[in-house]
Amino acid sequence: MPRGNFETIASKTKMLKIPRRKPSREHLEEALEQVKAGPGKAGATNWIFAKETVLLDARLQKEPVAEVEVQAVQLGPVILLTDPAEFFCQLGLDIKAGSPFPITFPVSLANGCVGYVPTKEAFDKNGGGYETRLSSYSNLEITAGPQMVEAAVQLAKEMTPDKLSERPAAPAFNNNPWEYGNLPPQVD
């Protein structure tokens, strides 16, 4: 494709409304006790997540549902599919697999920030990690990732990729490949 010569430049947007997960009453009461006790008594990690639970509860009073903008930006045969999340890698791979474009770039943390969005599998008994803990930064419902992937792929399928331009094959190395990576360490 000649530099800067795109036949199609276009964009589409889809807004999703995704509910936030809510801590149980027992979880919130325990979190309040741990926050009051302080990190020295509750333990640093427990206190941090307890504080996050209290912050999430305050946020839920004002914003129980997150507005999530998913966007598709087409530049010829290339598409950027954006979301306002810190996606798990698998969700980006799912976007690429579902896109009809020959060159697909999943783009995270675009047009906002709704925090971590793990895969559904990360919430299973063998999953876990700080990204799956209910907090002010990771709180969308468990199906948020697949919803965003589906919206991105749908937007891509509503667009038609331009044909990739033909390029000549790279010349052969003639048995003299790049050697910089094959040098031994130098320890004078």
Q: Which sequence ranges carry the predicted segments?
A:
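Non-catalytic substrate/cofactor recognition surfaces at enzyme active-site rims
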Residues: M1-D188
